[in-house]
């Protein structure tokens, strides 16, 4: 296993901390929009970044600013796209079938827009259950990003603080 530090951007416009009006404003203006300016900073500075874009957020980008998708596709050496679900919610409360549906719909939307997608999954809020890890593995996903700080203390202390492989 190699060790590499990467910047990961959890990109979800349906976050409770972002108003719809600010998000829609960020998409306006084509290549001069705030979102394209932000993406261009990474390109200009040759700063690699891993983007995890929620499927519903990607639908907004596709409709209101496809130029942003073009920038990402044109600069695969800068942008790494990872898998996300369609909806950004607390997946801990989902049934197996709805969890799978949400993830599959997100993956389908991401793969339909981006030419190069890593087989790594970023769960909403970095939270996922043991059962959902099993479901993700069955989907063929290679890796999952987890943030121990999002879990209760009794669970958090059981999560190994370094990248690791899980078997079983």
Regions from the language model: what does each represent?
Residues 33-37, 62-76, 153-166:
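Alpha-helical scaffolding within the catalytic cores
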């Amino acid at each position: 296993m190699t060790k590499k530090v990467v910047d990961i951007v959890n990109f979800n416009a349906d976050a409770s901390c972002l108003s719809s009006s600010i998000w829609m404003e960020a998409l306006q203006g084509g290549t001069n929009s705030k979102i394209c300016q932000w993406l261009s900073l990474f390109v200009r500075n040759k700063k690699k970044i891993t983007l995890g874009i929620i499927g519903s957020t990607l639908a907004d980008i596709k409709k209101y600013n496809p130029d942003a998708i073009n920038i990402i596709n044109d600069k695969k050496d800068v942008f790494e796209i990872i898998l996300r679900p369609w909806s950004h919610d607390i997946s801990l409360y989902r049934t197996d079938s709805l969890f799978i549906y949400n993830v599959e719909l997100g993956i389908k939307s991401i793969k339909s827009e981006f030419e190069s997608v890593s087989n790594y999954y970023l769960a909403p809020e970095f939270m996922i259950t043991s059962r959902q890890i099993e479901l993700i593995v069955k989907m063929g996903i290679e890796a999952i990003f987890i943030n121990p700080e999002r879990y209760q203390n009794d669970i958090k202390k059981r999560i190994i603080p370094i990248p690791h492989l899980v078997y079983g």
